[in-house]
Amino acid sequence: MFSPADNIFIILITGEFILGILGNGYIALVNWIDWIKKKKISTVDYILTNLVIARICLISVMVVNGIVIVLNPDVYTKNKQQIVIFTFWTFANYLNMWITTCLNVFYFLKIASSSHPLFLWLKWKIDMVVHWILLGCFAISLLVSLIAAIVLSCDYRFHAIAKHKRNITEMFXVSKIPYFEPLTLFNLFAIVPFIVSLISFFLLVRSLWRHTKQIKLYATGSRDPSTEVHVRAIKTMTSFIFFFFLYFISSILMTFSYLMTKYKLAVEFGEIAAILYPLGHSLILIVLNNKLRQIFVRMLTCRKIACVI
């Protein structure tokens, strides 16, 4: 029998799962159809398509992990099951982080202006090497997830502790302790791509400041297209920073949940908050991307007309 908190958790996480799949699936479908029609795809759409596929995987793994942990806490007594879940989560998490970083760096290189030779070389090269960069993201994520699987496979201490516990609730709390160090370590590794995104963000803000300063010399009373593009990209990157910070804090909360009296409630809250990252940022991308937003508005308009008819 589920408690009221469990019922609320299931309802919320199911709603997030549906919205996440629909939102990310919409981006992938629009870009795929556009690719088929034009026989080619832009670099930003190519990165976005790979990103939303990674996010669909991440959302799916997080939902499965949340439901399994909360509704079947004795999963921690079965080493292989927990290792499989954590390995897939690590892979999807890192793949999502690195591709998002690629998107942020791409925005910076394409929108910002600079006369630095390295910047100009990267700006020229990015379109030609994006396939290899994304392949590198896949390879890094796969390598880290395999290392995570090996580390957890070598750590059987939690099984030795859990098998002496008769109460499943106690088992849930105690068996997470050995995962503290690996979880914390792999969470900290995710800071690396985030720092790269943060650097790109500040450099883009600096570029906007310099551009705005130049525009003031030729004040026209309205923003020029370049300024609008700068602002839109900064909004996208700001939303990423916000949602990733929420995701990171939620991951830390779940990692330390075994120290809390209401650990089960902490895990439920952490899972719900963490899923907002791959869900919320993708919805922001739809709103700020002209093509995605216009197609969505046309779909809603056609639906309203069909309902009236």
UniProtKB/Swiss-Prot annotation:
What's the protein's topology in the membrane?
Multi-pass membrane protein
Could you list which ranges are Extracellular topological domains?
1-7, 72-82, 153-184, 261-266
Glycosylation sites (chain numbering): 167
Q: Where in the cell is it found?
A: Membrane
Span-the-membrane segments of this chain are 8-28, 51-71, 83-103, 132-152, 185-205, 240-260, 267-287
- Give a Gene Ontology cellular component term annotated to this protein: plasma membrane
Q: Is the keyword Aminoacyl-tRNA synthetase in the record?
A: no
Annotated keywords = G-protein coupled receptor, Glycoprotein, Membrane, Receptor, Sensory transduction, Taste, Transducer, Transmembrane, Transmembrane helix
User: What family does the database annotate?
Assistant: Belongs to the G-protein coupled receptor T2R family.
What this protein is reported to do is described as:
Receptor that may play a role in the perception of bitterness and is gustducin-linked. May play a role in sensing the chemical composition of the gastrointestinal content. The activity of this receptor may stimulate alpha gustducin, mediate PLC-beta-2 activation and lead to the gating of TRPM5.
Q: What else is known?
A: Most taste cells may be activated by a limited number of bitter compounds; individual taste cells can discriminate among bitter stimuli.
Name this protein carries in UniProt: Taste receptor type 2 member 8
Q: What organism is this sequence from?
A: Pan troglodytes
Classification of source organism = Eukaryota, Metazoa, Chordata, Craniata, Vertebrata
